[in-house]
């Protein structure tokens, strides 16, 4: 409303905006939920296949976006340096690093795969197509429902990593 009156004033439709005297009320920002260490462990323990375990570990240890996760190819991984090349928003390329546990689970997942698809994460059934964002979301929601967690979604892993980094003193 104040923007509209400011525009009226700028365009000389009114002399003075009546809302200028009204102070804006600051609304408190809601603190978004993150996963606890216990919740992350329960999700890992609840995975019934190596793909989901590797996926949860990669999301947890790197904080990458779900869109970046599904774009990953096998060739983007460097196990020796525990890093992967991610194509982010605007097709910008950057390196992210994953932990030793993620390395082990990714290697186990890749060693079990029998397909020749270059995609890092593929469907569990033939024809083993690249996993889509919706596939990741559905899978995580299913794990969450089975554990009676409310609202398990990929972005929460990113927020959890950022919150943990801030708690440990990262500026």
Segments (PLM) and residue ranges:
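Conserved catalytic core of the tyrosine transesterase superfamily
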Residues: 1-171
């Amino acid at each position: 409303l104040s923007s509209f009156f400011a525009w009226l004033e700028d365009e000389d439709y009114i002399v003075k905006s009546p809302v200028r005297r009204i102070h804006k009320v600051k609304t408190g920002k809601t603190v978004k939920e993150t996963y606890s260490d216990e919740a992350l462990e329960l999700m890992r323990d609840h995975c019934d296949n190596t793909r989901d375990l590797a996926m949860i570990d990669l999301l947890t240890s790197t904080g990458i976006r779900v869109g970046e996760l599904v774009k990953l190819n096998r060739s983007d991984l460097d196990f020796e340096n525990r890093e992967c090349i991610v194509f982010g928003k605007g097709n910008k390329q950057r390196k992210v690093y994953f932990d030793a546990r993620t390395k082990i689970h990714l290697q186990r997942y890749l060693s079990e795969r029998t397909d020749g698809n270059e995609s890092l994460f593929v469907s569990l059934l033939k024809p083993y197509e690249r996993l889509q964002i919706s596939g990741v979301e559905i899978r995580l929601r299913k794990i969450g429902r089975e554990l009676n967690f409310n609202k398990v979604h990929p972005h929460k892993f990113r927020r959890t990593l950022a919150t943990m980094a801030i708690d440990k003193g990262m500026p």
